[in-house]
Protein backbone atom coordinates (compact mmCIF):
# COMPACT_ATOMS: atom_id res chain seq x y z
CA UNK A 1 0.00 0.00 0.00
CA UNK A 2 1.49 3.35 -1.08
CA UNK A 3 0.19 6.60 0.38
CA UNK A 4 1.21 9.86 -1.31
CA UNK A 5 0.68 12.93 0.87
CA UNK A 6 1.22 16.67 0.85
CA UNK A 7 4.27 17.33 3.03
CA UNK A 8 2.44 20.06 4.95
CA UNK A 9 -0.32 17.80 6.29
CA UNK A 10 0.38 17.27 10.00
CA UNK A 11 0.36 13.92 11.81
CA UNK A 12 0.37 11.85 8.61
CA UNK A 13 2.71 9.27 10.11
CA UNK A 14 0.79 9.12 13.38
CA UNK A 15 -2.51 8.45 11.61
CA UNK A 16 -1.53 6.56 8.45
CA UNK A 17 1.75 4.71 9.10
CA UNK A 18 -0.14 1.53 9.97
CA UNK A 19 -1.62 1.33 6.48
CA UNK A 20 1.53 1.24 4.37
CA UNK A 21 4.43 3.25 2.97
CA UNK A 22 4.08 7.05 3.08
CA UNK A 23 5.78 9.35 0.57
CA UNK A 24 5.50 13.10 1.13
CA UNK A 25 5.82 15.83 -1.51
CA UNK A 26 5.23 19.58 -1.77
CA UNK A 27 1.55 20.00 -2.60
CA UNK A 28 2.17 22.02 -5.76
CA UNK A 29 4.68 19.39 -6.98
CA UNK A 30 2.30 16.41 -6.89
CA UNK A 31 1.99 15.22 -10.51
CA UNK A 32 1.28 12.09 -12.58
CA UNK A 33 4.72 10.63 -11.85
CA UNK A 34 4.16 11.17 -8.13
CA UNK A 35 0.91 9.19 -8.05
CA UNK A 36 1.58 6.55 -10.73
CA UNK A 37 1.93 3.81 -8.09
CA UNK A 38 -0.14 5.36 -5.29
CA UNK A 39 -3.18 3.70 -3.76
CA UNK A 40 -4.09 6.67 -1.56
CA UNK A 41 -3.65 10.40 -2.21
CA UNK A 42 -3.87 12.94 0.62
CA UNK A 43 -3.83 16.62 -0.34
CA UNK A 44 -4.65 20.20 0.58
CA UNK A 45 -6.27 22.89 -1.55
CA UNK A 46 -3.04 23.69 -3.44
CA UNK A 47 -3.19 20.39 -5.38
CA UNK A 48 -5.61 20.10 -8.30
CA UNK A 49 -6.81 16.49 -8.32
CA UNK A 50 -8.46 15.68 -11.65
CA UNK A 51 -8.54 13.20 -14.52
CA UNK A 52 -5.24 14.49 -15.88
CA UNK A 53 -3.51 13.73 -12.57
CA UNK A 54 -5.12 10.39 -11.74
CA UNK A 55 -5.88 8.64 -15.03
CA UNK A 56 -3.94 5.38 -15.21
CA UNK A 57 -2.99 5.43 -11.54
CA UNK A 58 -4.17 2.87 -8.95
CA UNK A 59 -5.48 5.61 -6.63
CA UNK A 60 -8.78 4.53 -5.09
CA UNK A 61 -9.05 6.96 -2.17
CA UNK A 62 -8.48 10.73 -2.18
CA UNK A 63 -8.59 12.72 1.04
CA UNK A 64 -8.33 16.50 1.28
CA UNK A 65 -7.66 18.12 4.65
CA UNK A 66 -9.82 21.10 3.71
CA UNK A 67 -13.42 22.23 3.89
CA UNK A 68 -13.55 23.23 0.23
CA UNK A 69 -13.55 20.79 -2.67
CA UNK A 70 -13.13 23.14 -5.65
CA UNK A 71 -9.69 21.56 -6.29
CA UNK A 72 -11.22 18.06 -6.67
CA UNK A 73 -12.77 16.71 -9.88
CA UNK A 74 -15.68 14.94 -8.19
CA UNK A 75 -17.27 13.98 -11.51
CA UNK A 76 -14.14 12.06 -12.49
CA UNK A 77 -14.00 10.41 -9.07
CA UNK A 78 -17.52 9.09 -9.57
CA UNK A 79 -16.78 7.83 -13.07
CA UNK A 80 -13.53 6.16 -11.98
CA UNK A 81 -14.93 4.62 -8.80
CA UNK A 82 -12.65 6.66 -6.55
CA UNK A 83 -13.80 7.22 -2.98
CA UNK A 84 -13.04 10.66 -1.57
CA UNK A 85 -13.37 12.64 1.61
CA UNK A 86 -12.97 16.26 2.61
CA UNK A 87 -12.76 17.61 6.16
CA UNK A 88 -15.91 19.71 6.61
CA UNK A 89 -15.67 22.16 9.48
CA UNK A 90 -12.11 21.23 10.40
CA UNK A 91 -10.83 24.81 10.37
CA UNK A 92 -14.09 26.68 10.98
CA UNK A 93 -13.12 27.72 14.48
CA UNK A 94 -9.75 29.01 13.31
CA UNK A 95 -11.36 31.17 10.62
CA UNK A 96 -13.82 32.59 13.16
CA UNK A 97 -10.89 33.48 15.43
CA UNK A 98 -9.23 35.21 12.45
CA UNK A 99 -12.33 37.25 11.71
CA UNK A 100 -12.70 38.25 15.36
CA UNK A 101 -9.06 39.33 15.50
CA UNK A 102 -9.52 41.35 12.32
CA UNK A 103 -12.61 43.07 13.71
CA UNK A 104 -10.74 44.03 16.88
CA UNK A 105 -7.90 45.51 14.81
CA UNK A 106 -10.28 47.50 12.62
CA UNK A 107 -12.20 48.75 15.66
CA UNK A 108 -8.99 50.02 17.27
CA UNK A 109 -7.91 51.80 14.09
CA UNK A 110 -11.24 53.54 13.58
CA UNK A 111 -12.24 53.92 17.23
CA UNK A 112 -15.67 52.34 16.82
CA UNK A 113 -17.83 50.14 19.04
CA UNK A 114 -18.15 46.71 17.45
CA UNK A 115 -21.52 46.20 19.12
CA UNK A 116 -22.96 49.11 17.12
CA UNK A 117 -22.10 47.75 13.67
CA UNK A 118 -24.30 45.68 11.37
CA UNK A 119 -22.62 42.48 10.17
CA UNK A 120 -23.26 40.76 6.87
CA UNK A 121 -22.15 37.13 6.53
CA UNK A 122 -22.15 35.74 2.98
CA UNK A 123 -22.29 31.95 3.12
CA UNK A 124 -23.79 30.12 6.10
CA UNK A 125 -21.98 26.81 5.84
CA UNK A 126 -19.50 25.36 8.33
CA UNK A 127 -17.46 28.54 8.74
CA UNK A 128 -20.12 31.16 8.13
CA UNK A 129 -22.59 29.33 10.34
CA UNK A 130 -20.10 29.23 13.20
CA UNK A 131 -19.35 32.94 12.80
CA UNK A 132 -23.05 33.80 12.80
CA UNK A 133 -23.52 31.92 16.08
CA UNK A 134 -20.65 33.79 17.72
CA UNK A 135 -21.69 37.25 16.52
CA UNK A 136 -25.32 36.76 17.49
CA UNK A 137 -24.23 35.25 20.79
CA UNK A 138 -22.45 38.53 21.49
CA UNK A 139 -25.74 40.32 20.84
CA UNK A 140 -24.63 41.91 17.59
CA UNK A 141 -26.87 42.56 14.58
CA UNK A 142 -26.20 40.00 11.83
CA UNK A 143 -27.71 39.61 8.36
CA UNK A 144 -27.08 36.46 6.34
CA UNK A 145 -26.99 35.81 2.59
CA UNK A 146 -27.01 32.20 1.41
CA UNK A 147 -29.28 31.61 -1.61
CA UNK A 148 -28.94 27.82 -1.55
CA UNK A 149 -29.85 27.52 2.12
CA UNK A 150 -32.65 30.00 1.67
CA UNK A 151 -34.09 27.89 -1.16
CA UNK A 152 -33.76 24.67 0.84
CA UNK A 153 -34.79 25.90 4.28
CA UNK A 154 -36.54 29.23 3.95
CA UNK A 155 -35.88 31.31 7.02
CA UNK A 156 -34.43 34.70 7.76
CA UNK A 157 -32.05 35.36 4.87
CA UNK A 158 -31.48 38.46 2.75
CA UNK A 159 -30.29 38.95 -0.82
CA UNK A 160 -26.71 39.98 -1.48
CA UNK A 161 -27.93 43.37 -2.66
CA UNK A 162 -29.84 43.91 0.59
CA UNK A 163 -26.83 42.83 2.61
CA UNK A 164 -24.48 45.22 0.79
CA UNK A 165 -26.97 48.04 1.26
CA UNK A 166 -27.51 47.55 4.99
CA UNK A 167 -24.29 46.18 6.50
CA UNK A 168 -21.19 47.97 7.80
CA UNK A 169 -19.11 44.77 7.81
CA UNK A 170 -19.11 42.14 5.04
CA UNK A 171 -17.46 38.78 5.79
CA UNK A 172 -17.24 36.26 2.94
CA UNK A 173 -17.43 32.51 3.63
CA UNK A 174 -18.61 30.93 0.39
CA UNK A 175 -17.11 28.03 -1.55
CA UNK A 176 -15.69 28.85 -4.97
CA UNK A 177 -18.04 27.84 -7.77
CA UNK A 178 -17.72 28.90 -11.38
CA UNK A 179 -21.04 27.84 -12.87
CA UNK A 180 -24.73 27.82 -12.11
CA UNK A 181 -27.15 30.40 -10.83
CA UNK A 182 -25.28 30.80 -7.55
CA UNK A 183 -21.75 30.99 -8.97
CA UNK A 184 -19.40 32.73 -6.55
CA UNK A 185 -16.66 33.56 -9.07
CA UNK A 186 -16.23 37.36 -8.79
CA UNK A 187 -19.31 37.47 -6.57
CA UNK A 188 -18.12 40.90 -5.56
CA UNK A 189 -17.36 42.47 -8.91
CA UNK A 190 -16.72 46.12 -9.69
CA UNK A 191 -20.41 46.98 -9.71
CA UNK A 192 -21.10 45.46 -6.30
CA UNK A 193 -17.89 46.81 -4.78
CA UNK A 194 -18.92 50.30 -5.83
CA UNK A 195 -22.23 49.79 -4.01
CA UNK A 196 -20.63 49.16 -0.61
CA UNK A 197 -21.88 51.50 2.11
CA UNK A 198 -19.69 54.36 3.24
CA UNK A 199 -17.13 53.05 5.72
CA UNK A 200 -17.70 49.36 5.00
CA UNK A 201 -15.20 46.78 6.22
CA UNK A 202 -14.73 43.89 3.77
CA UNK A 203 -13.20 40.61 4.98
CA UNK A 204 -12.42 37.75 2.58
CA UNK A 205 -11.28 34.52 4.24
CA UNK A 206 -13.06 32.27 1.72
CA UNK A 207 -11.45 31.95 -1.72
CA UNK A 208 -9.53 34.65 -3.57
CA UNK A 209 -11.59 34.77 -6.79
CA UNK A 210 -14.82 35.37 -4.86
CA UNK A 211 -13.71 39.02 -5.08
CA UNK A 212 -12.49 40.58 -8.32
CA UNK A 213 -9.05 41.58 -7.03
CA UNK A 214 -8.27 44.06 -9.80
CA UNK A 215 -11.59 45.82 -9.32
CA UNK A 216 -11.11 45.83 -5.55
CA UNK A 217 -7.73 47.54 -5.88
CA UNK A 218 -9.24 50.24 -8.09
CA UNK A 219 -12.18 50.79 -5.75
CA UNK A 220 -9.93 51.00 -2.67
CA UNK A 221 -7.79 53.62 -4.42
CA UNK A 222 -10.88 55.66 -5.20
CA UNK A 223 -12.65 55.26 -1.85
CA UNK A 224 -10.56 55.86 1.25
CA UNK A 225 -13.60 55.21 3.43
CA UNK A 226 -13.47 51.46 2.72
CA UNK A 227 -11.30 49.01 4.66
CA UNK A 228 -10.31 45.56 3.42
CA UNK A 229 -8.90 42.46 5.08
CA UNK A 230 -7.70 39.77 2.66
CA UNK A 231 -6.45 36.33 3.59
CA UNK A 232 -7.00 34.87 0.11
CA UNK A 233 -5.84 36.11 -3.29
CA UNK A 234 -7.09 35.60 -6.79
CA UNK A 235 -3.81 34.31 -8.24
CA UNK A 236 -2.18 32.90 -5.11
CA UNK A 237 0.57 32.09 -4.42
CA UNK A 238 1.16 35.11 -6.67
CA UNK A 239 -0.05 38.19 -4.82
CA UNK A 240 -0.66 41.70 -6.11
CA UNK A 241 1.56 43.64 -3.69
CA UNK A 242 -0.17 46.90 -4.59
CA UNK A 243 -3.50 45.42 -3.45
CA UNK A 244 -1.91 44.15 -0.24
CA UNK A 245 -0.66 47.69 0.41
CA UNK A 246 -4.25 48.93 0.25
CA UNK A 247 -5.48 46.43 2.86
CA UNK A 248 -5.60 47.01 6.59
CA UNK A 249 -4.65 43.37 7.10
CA UNK A 250 -3.13 41.07 4.48
CA UNK A 251 -2.21 37.44 5.18
CA UNK A 252 -1.15 34.35 3.16
CA UNK A 253 -4.26 32.12 3.29
CA UNK A 254 -3.80 31.18 6.95
CA UNK A 255 -7.15 32.18 8.46
CA UNK A 256 -7.96 28.58 9.31
CA UNK A 257 -4.39 27.56 10.12
CA UNK A 258 -4.83 26.78 13.80
CA UNK A 259 -2.95 23.73 15.01
CA UNK A 260 -6.26 22.23 16.13
CA UNK A 261 -7.86 22.81 12.74
CA UNK A 262 -4.99 21.36 10.71
CA UNK A 263 -4.72 18.28 12.89
CA UNK A 264 -8.50 17.91 12.96
CA UNK A 265 -8.47 17.82 9.16
CA UNK A 266 -5.99 14.95 9.17
CA UNK A 267 -8.06 13.10 11.76
CA UNK A 268 -11.20 13.48 9.63
CA UNK A 269 -9.67 11.98 6.50
CA UNK A 270 -8.16 9.20 8.63
CA UNK A 271 -11.63 8.42 9.97
CA UNK A 272 -13.01 8.44 6.42
CA UNK A 273 -10.26 6.09 5.25
CA UNK A 274 -10.99 3.69 8.11
CA UNK A 275 -14.63 3.65 7.01
CA UNK A 276 -13.52 3.02 3.42
CA UNK A 277 -11.52 -0.01 4.59
CA UNK A 278 -14.19 -1.16 7.03
CA UNK A 279 -11.68 -1.02 9.87
CA UNK A 280 -11.97 0.33 13.40
CA UNK A 281 -10.06 3.52 14.23
CA UNK A 282 -6.86 2.94 16.18
CA UNK A 283 -5.67 6.54 16.67
CA UNK A 284 -7.38 9.43 18.50
CA UNK A 285 -6.66 13.12 17.92
CA UNK A 286 -7.23 13.98 21.58
CA UNK A 287 -4.16 11.94 22.51
CA UNK A 288 -1.99 13.85 20.03
CA UNK A 289 -2.89 17.51 20.63
CA UNK A 290 -0.34 19.27 22.87
CA UNK A 291 -1.31 21.44 25.83
CA UNK A 292 -2.02 25.06 24.79
CA UNK A 293 0.55 27.74 25.59
CA UNK A 294 -2.12 29.85 27.29
CA UNK A 295 -4.60 27.53 28.99
CA UNK A 296 -6.40 30.16 31.06
CA UNK A 297 -7.23 33.86 31.25
CA UNK A 298 -8.41 35.53 34.47
CA UNK A 299 -10.67 38.58 34.55
CA UNK A 300 -12.20 40.61 37.33
CA UNK A 301 -15.97 40.87 37.17
CA UNK A 302 -15.74 44.66 36.83
CA UNK A 303 -13.73 44.45 33.59
CA UNK A 304 -15.06 46.47 30.66
CA UNK A 305 -16.81 43.99 28.32
CA UNK A 306 -15.21 45.36 25.14
CA UNK A 307 -11.76 45.17 26.74
CA UNK A 308 -12.49 41.66 28.02
CA UNK A 309 -13.53 40.53 24.53
CA UNK A 310 -10.23 41.74 23.10
CA UNK A 311 -8.25 40.19 25.95
CA UNK A 312 -9.83 36.76 25.46
CA UNK A 313 -9.46 36.75 21.68
CA UNK A 314 -5.89 38.01 21.64
CA UNK A 315 -4.80 35.57 24.32
CA UNK A 316 -5.19 33.01 21.54
CA UNK A 317 -4.64 34.87 18.26
CA UNK A 318 -3.79 38.31 16.88
CA UNK A 319 -3.64 38.57 13.06
CA UNK A 320 -1.32 41.58 13.13
CA UNK A 321 1.71 39.30 13.49
CA UNK A 322 0.75 37.34 10.38
CA UNK A 323 0.13 40.60 8.55
CA UNK A 324 3.61 41.89 9.42
CA UNK A 325 5.30 38.63 8.39
CA UNK A 326 3.40 38.60 5.09
CA UNK A 327 4.24 42.20 4.19
CA UNK A 328 7.93 41.54 4.79
CA UNK A 329 7.72 38.62 2.35
CA UNK A 330 6.28 40.60 -0.56
CA UNK A 331 8.68 41.07 -3.45
CA UNK A 332 8.77 42.32 -7.02
CA UNK A 333 10.46 39.04 -7.92
CA UNK A 334 7.46 36.81 -8.69
CA UNK A 335 9.27 33.51 -8.14
CA UNK A 336 10.67 34.72 -4.82
CA UNK A 337 7.29 36.03 -3.71
CA UNK A 338 5.50 32.78 -4.61
CA UNK A 339 8.09 30.78 -2.70
CA UNK A 340 7.75 33.07 0.31
CA UNK A 341 3.95 32.69 0.28
CA UNK A 342 4.21 28.91 0.47
CA UNK A 343 7.04 29.17 3.00
CA UNK A 344 4.94 31.21 5.41
CA UNK A 345 2.24 28.56 5.25
CA UNK A 346 4.65 25.64 5.55
CA UNK A 347 6.42 27.09 8.59
CA UNK A 348 3.39 28.66 10.21
CA UNK A 349 3.83 29.00 14.01
CA UNK A 350 1.69 27.08 16.45
CA UNK A 351 -1.68 28.72 17.02
CA UNK A 352 -4.56 27.40 19.08
CA UNK A 353 -8.32 28.08 19.16
CA UNK A 354 -10.50 30.11 21.49
CA UNK A 355 -12.74 27.18 22.37
CA UNK A 356 -9.73 25.53 24.01
CA UNK A 357 -9.30 28.47 26.39
CA UNK A 358 -10.56 28.56 29.97
CA UNK A 359 -11.70 31.94 31.33
CA UNK A 360 -11.86 32.54 35.07
CA UNK A 361 -14.06 35.45 36.17
CA UNK A 362 -13.30 36.75 39.67
CA UNK A 363 -16.79 37.53 40.93
CA UNK A 364 -20.04 37.53 39.00
CA UNK A 365 -20.70 39.32 35.72
CA UNK A 366 -23.54 38.37 33.40
CA UNK A 367 -21.99 40.47 30.62
CA UNK A 368 -18.62 38.73 30.81
CA UNK A 369 -20.20 35.29 31.11
CA UNK A 370 -22.18 36.00 27.96
CA UNK A 371 -19.00 36.91 26.08
CA UNK A 372 -17.27 33.72 27.22
CA UNK A 373 -20.22 31.57 26.15
CA UNK A 374 -20.56 33.33 22.80
CA UNK A 375 -16.88 32.87 21.99
CA UNK A 376 -17.07 29.19 22.84
CA UNK A 377 -14.47 29.40 25.60
CA UNK A 378 -14.99 27.60 28.90
CA UNK A 379 -15.82 29.55 32.03
CA UNK A 380 -13.93 28.18 35.02
Curated annotation (Swiss-Prot):
Residues the record marks as active site: 207, 236, 253
Superkingdom as given in the UniProt entry: Bacteria
Key words, A-Z: Cytoplasm, NAD, Oxidoreductase, Pyridoxine biosynthesis
Xref: CDD domains: ErythrP_dh
Entry-linked InterPro entries: D-isomer_2_OHA_DH_cat_dom, D-isomer_DH_CS, D-isomer_DH_NAD-bd, Erythronate-4-P_DHase, Erythronate-4-P_DHase_dimer, NAD(P)-bd_dom_sf, PdxB_dimer_sf
Sites where the protein binds NAD(+): 146, 174, 231, 256
Gene Ontology CC terms: cytosol
Pfam families in the cross-refs: 2-Hacid_dh, 2-Hacid_dh_C, DUF3410
Enzyme Commission no: 1.1.1.290
Free-text function comment from the UniProt entry: Catalyzes the oxidation of erythronate-4-phosphate to 3-hydroxy-2-oxo-4-phosphonooxybutanoate.
Protein name in the entry: Erythronate-4-phosphate dehydrogenase
Organism: Pseudomonas fluorescens (strain ATCC BAA-477 / NRRL B-23932 / Pf-5)
Gene: pdxB
Amino acid sequence: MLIVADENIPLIEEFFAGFGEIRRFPGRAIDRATVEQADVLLVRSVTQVDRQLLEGSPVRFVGTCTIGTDHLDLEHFQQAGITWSSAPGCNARGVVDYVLGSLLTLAEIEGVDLAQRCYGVVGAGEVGGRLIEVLRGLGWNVLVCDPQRQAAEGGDYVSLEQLLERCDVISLHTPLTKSGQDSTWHLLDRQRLNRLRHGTWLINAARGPVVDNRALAEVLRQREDLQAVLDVWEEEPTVDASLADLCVLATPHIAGYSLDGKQRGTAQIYQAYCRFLGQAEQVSLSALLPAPWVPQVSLNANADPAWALAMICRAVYDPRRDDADFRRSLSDDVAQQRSAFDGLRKHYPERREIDGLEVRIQGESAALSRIVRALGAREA
